[in-house]
Design a protein with these regions (language model features):
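Intrinsically disordered, low-complexity basic segments at termini and long loops, enriched
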Residues: 1-48
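Domain-level detector for secreted/extracellular nuclease and nuclease-toxin modules, and
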Residues: 32-452
Length: 452
């Protein structure tokens, strides 16, 4: 029988506690030597300690992984109002998954800015800042030692007022040489665009807005106040665009064209609203939602259509993209000019204003369209609505300019609109090539299949 060495159990235990992560060869030699000298009783103790040593190694390796706890924020829970502009990795913040979750590694930074909206606010702030960075400390907690006195809950970050968004005219051109405008935010002299508009500066008409739509857009931030529309300098100093969209202004404008028929068209039920091209809730966070309230993203739209089939299409499409996991590019635009009968029984084009040369501007569109394109599969579809509650069913049918594919396919079960309802807006669908045969607005992109 081998002779036991007294006290070696204590030595081994001490060795484990002092350096549990040691991989030194001498240590392993000592352990092997001691193991060979231990009696049965001490050998059992040694085996137990060896097992503990292994567990300690596993635990300490797990705890020593770099990064620590992640931050996890949700678009419906952790984002308050007035929300700052939020920049991550050099671009405006976007969720990481279809449920609106933002996931950051421990130590990742975000830039918060309230430019044009006062200063940042948080209950833990040490000083006022217009723009500042914060770093993830796990959960919903963020830190900045120069600005915050403790790790601080993200949901409490606010601006004094909503930050200012704006448009800028680019050097890029779109349909028929019109200018491309970008709408977004300026932070520390850097412009961050949310969407772009092809805008006709002669007729003051939004041709289309282009933006992306992803599965997370269905989880847009709620309880975001609607700001006033802004024009920047796009409409010039002469055109009273706010007044023209008001009940009094639109009534005065349309009465010049239809005379005594005005009461049949502009009343408590039928009137023109500011029709969004890119919808407010086509953007997931408050700073994106607010930026849709710009006149380069707007055209006159009959209220029944605005709140009827057009709104239904927006909601259904967001849900469809969410459920199918599509990553899409959307072109939402206008085409043609709607007509009304004047007091002589003749149809006339409807505009809201005439410029200094008596040229009509700000047309009331005949059609609104939404072309949805999925670049990965090169599939697309066009949805069209007639912006005119005063057309009869037969007149509307004559205005359908393509083969209405939604009317005969069960694949569009997810569409809940009422396409044959005049007040809500007669509506139909086309393949993209069929749509292009009539409407030549869109830039070139390859479409090889139908998105449905």
């Amino acid at each position: 029988m081998q002779k036991c060495l007294p006290g070696h159990g204590r030595i081994i235990t001490f060795m484990f506690l002092v350096d549990p992560l040691s991989q030194n060869k001498k240590v392993h030699k000592v352990m092997n030597f001691l193991s060979s000298k231990l009696s049965c009783r001490y050998n059992k103790i040694f085996c137990a300690l060896s097992m503990i040593h292994r567990y300690i190694l596993i635990i300490m390796c797990a705890l020593s992984k770099p990064g620590g706890e992640r931050c996890r924020l949700n678009s419906r829970i952790h984002f308050g109002e007035p929300l700052p502009i939020i920049i991550s990795h050099g671009k405006l913040l976007e969720p990481a998954d279809a449920n609106g979750n933002v996931i950051l590694e421990n130590g990742d930074t975000l830039t918060l800015s309230c430019e044009g909206g006062g200063n940042l606010y948080h209950p833990n702030m040490l000083q006022s800042e217009e723009t500042a960075t914060i770093s993830c400390k796990g959960g919903e907690n963020f830190q900045n030692d120069n600005w915050l006195n403790n790790p601080s809950a993200f949901s409490s970050f606010r601006c004094s007022f909503a930050p200012n968004y704006s448009s800028r005219r680019t050097v890029r051109l779109c349909h028929q040489g019109n200018a491309v405008f970008e709408v977004g935010y300026t932070v520390q002299r850097e412009f961050y665009a949310l969407y772009e508009s092809c805008f006709n500066e002669l007729t003051l008409n939004a041709v289309y807005s282009k933006y992306t739509q992803r599965p997370y857009n269905a989880k847009f931030q709620t309880r975001v106040n609607r700001p006033f529309f802004i024009a920047n300098d796009v409409y010039g100093a002469v055109v009273p665009v706010d007044y023209l969209f008001s009940p009094k202004g639109q009534r005065a404008a349309v009465s010049l064209l239809v005379g005594n028929m005005i009461d049949s068209y502009i009343n408590n039920v039928d009137f023109l609203s500011r029709g969004h091209l890119a919808a407010k809730t086509d953007f997931v966070f408050a700073f994106g939602e607010r930026a849709t309230f710009h006149y380069v993203n707007c055209a006159p739209q009959w209220y029944g259509f605005n709140s009827g089939n057009w709104n239904t299409l927006e909601v259904d499409l967001r849900n469809f993209i969410h459920d199918t996991g599509l990553d899409t590019v959307i072109y939402t635009g206008t085409y043609g000019v709607t007509q009304l009968y004047n007091d002589n029984g003749r149809r006339v084009d409807i505009y809201l204003y005439s410029d200094e040369n008596n040229n009509p501007v700000i047309p009331v569109p005949l059609y609104y369209y939404k072309v949805v394109y999925e670049p990965t599969s090169k599939r697309g579809i066009a949805f069209i609505g007639i912006n005119g509650p005063h057309y009869t069913a037969n007149e509307a049918e004559d205005l359908f300019f393509c083969n209405n594919i939604c009317n005969r396919s069960a694949a569009f079960y997810w569409l809940t609109w009422h396409p044959h309802n005049a007040h809500e807006g007669y509506s139909f669908c086309c393949t993209v090539p069929d749509f292009r045969n009539t409407v030549g607005h869109l830039p070139s992109f390859e479409v090889t299949g139908l998105l449905m």
